[in-house]
Amino acid sequence: MTNNTQHTFRKKWGQNFLADTNLLRKIVRTINPTVDDAILEIGPGEGALTERVLPLVKYMAAIEIDPKLIKYLNGRDDLQDCHFIHKDVLMQKLNSLPIPTPIKIIGNIPYNITSPILFWLIEQRAHWT
């Protein structure tokens, strides 16, 4: 499968990208981002959620494992204020990432890594809200 950027979805990472604008609006409303928030987005994909949250917060970073998506995201002019990190989130410690605390964590997480990410978050509970 491909989408409008011609990015080939990578099965090994369980990639799926948000495209439904109504769903994205609901997610942003649920997140309720504020001007004081520092946000870490896990798996930004093509940046559909990123582009809606970024203008509403003080600081935003997004961690993405796919090098092709990192290149694409870094090339988007509308996302220049977001700090993109090319790493596997499960191999990171929140306090080592360049993000002010406390951190709010958001993401469209693939099913195949939901449990590992939840356990990763629990281990690092002191660093996020």
Label each region the model flagged:
Residues 1-129:
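Catalytic cores of RNA-modifying enzymes
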